[in-house]
Amino acid sequence: MAGEKDFSGLEEKLGVKFINPDYLIQALVHRSYLNEHPDFRLGHNERLEFLGDAVVELIVTEYLYNNYPNPEGDLTNWRAALVNAVMLSAVCKDMGVEEYLYLSRGESKDVGTKARQYILANAFEAIVGAIYLDRGYDVVK
């Protein structure tokens, strides 16, 4: 269950100590995990991912807008180059997020696959959503 994992290392890498650690835990729960653990006390991360996607887009858009006078087309292309599954999953890999994920046995075996890349990218967005809910926009930025 949730108590089996120590998230302090991940919180340190994120630079955030969660007020409500359930947000972080839920951000790491893939839908497949709940198929094998139907009594798990939290839901999967898809709603947090939905929220986090919007927050990531806003943060990157705001940064580009405030720091580059380029036309809209350039800014849109740069944002697309920064906010995609390849980049977001790479950030998660660098932070060691994989070791904290709650995955089904089948998903746990698919290391290094395209599917894992999307799981990590989605986890990144869910973590951002969790930080946003727990600590607000200024902290998540």
What annotation goes with each model-predicted range?
Residues A2-K141:
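RNase III-family endoribonuclease catalytic core
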